[in-house]
Amino acid sequence: LNREVFDIHEMIKHVAASFEGVCTQKKISIELVFATKHLNVNADKRKIQQVLYNLLDNAIKFSDPDSIITIETTDRGEKVYTAVKDNGIGIPRAALGKIWERFYKSDLSRGKDKKGTGLGLAIVKEAVQAHGENITVVSTEGVGTEFSFSLPKAAG
């Protein structure tokens, strides 16, 4: 890992902005709910950018038009939690344990436009765990999905 101190909020804004075009197209808005003005973490910038990109990409892919995706940060003790929530199709309970596997796709029949390698969440989990941290998922079919991961807060 190539750890450095950076503001997770700046990174979230940057990643969210990179999806502006597709969000406009699908009429999806991204709402940012930040714990504080600035929130520094000590992590591998490139890997965490990939984590945020993959989670947001999935949230957009599985969300209906005219919906809202929320990215929220929480400052808790030595940790910073980042959650990506959507009101999309949700993940079937039977599939929840498998979503982290490489090349796993929840159900090909659920959408022909759902392009992807099935590597996104495997990469996300590996990146978060490489930091000695965790990622969790809560999902309800037809209601939506929330992914939340922790990172070490930067000292100071």
Tell where the protein language model's regions lie, with residue ranges.
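Acidic ATP/Mg2+-coordinating residue in the GHKL
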Residues: D86
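Short helix-loop "hinge" at the ATP-lid/N-box region of the Bergerat-fold HATPase_c
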Residues: A59-I60
